[in-house]
Regions:
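A generic structural motif
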Residues: 13, 72-75, 121, 183-188
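Short conserved micro-motifs at the rims of enzyme active sites and ligand-binding pockets
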Residues: 18-20, 35-37, 77-79, 124-127, ...
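Short amphipathic alpha-helices in soluble, non-transmembrane regions
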Residues: 128-135, 139-152, 192-200
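PLP-dependent enzyme catalytic core of the Aspartate aminotransferase-like
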Residues: 169-216
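Structural alpha-beta junctions
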Residues: 98, 150-159, 204-210
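Active-site C-terminal subdomain of aminotransferase-like
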Residues: 1-100, 106
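Conserved small-domain helix->loop->beta segment predominantly found in fold-type I
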Residues: 51-59, 66-73, 77-84, 93-142, ...
Length: 216
């Protein structure tokens, strides 16, 4: 990070404030001029108004939430929250790794990881398959991932999002995965176990996709 000229931060993520609060820190304070703007009726060139150094004009005062959080939660509080989120992500990744019904796609560096439901027979088929056959299997898995994610959301017990990412071991093929960010301090190990159990049950409810996968 010390090699960067600037660092941008989305405070609504691990600083636990509402969306809309972002900030940028410059190594060289003079670089703030690169985002300076002026208007004839306000923020005239040469004025000392800090509002000229922003990508926005009128603002809602979200900076106050960042300021307040830095003082109320403080450094020890953020350290506790972030360490807990990292621990939970590692725990969840280990749960996935040790369950032969799932494939851990990206291991967490901090608190974000991706995975998907892949029955053990399908995992073995993917290992043996040539690229063209892998593509066929992955497209069916994409359908199954979408089915599970939508049904889980509709059930209302738990929720994970989904996204597409390139996976190196599948020759850069883009596959649909579950995307999890473990930032909620109220999330427990039991909740994480329940999420996987529910996803396994939902997969069995697929009357067309799962049978096709298991037949390959």
């Amino acid at each position: 990070i010390e090699r960067a000229d600037s660092v941008t931060i989305d405070a609504h993520k691990q600083m636990y404030v509402p969306m809309g609060a972002g900030l940028v820190v410059f190594k060289n304070p003079a670089l703030v001029a690169s985002i300076e703007h002026h208007a004839e009726y306000i923020l005239r060139k040469g004025s000392k108004d800090l509002g000229s150094h922003t990508l926005e004009g009128s603002r809602s005062g979200m900076a106050m939430l960042v300021y307040s959080s830095l003082h109320i939660i403080s450094r020890p509080g953020y350290e506790l929250l972030i360490n807990q989120s990292i621990e939970k992500a590692k725990y969840f990744a280990d749960l996935i790794d040790n369950d032969d019904s799932f494939e851990l796609v990206t291991r967490p560096e901090l608190c974000l990881l991706t995975y998907r439901y892949v029955p053990q027979l399908t995992q073995q088929a993917l290992i043996k398959a040539l690229p063209l056959s892998q593509n066929t299997i992955n497209r069916l898995l994409d359908e199954l991932t979408k089915f599970i994610q939508k049904r889980q959301r509709e059930n209302g017990q738990s929720f994970v999002s989904r996204t597409k990412i390139e996976v190196a071991k599948y020759q850069g093929d883009k596959v649909l995965v579950f995307r999890v960010v473990l930032a909620n301090p109220l999330t427990t190990h039991e909740i994480l176990k329940d999420i996987l159990e529910e996803q396994k049950m939902i997969a069995q409810e697929s009357q067309t996709i799962l049978p096709k996968l298991l037949a390959l």
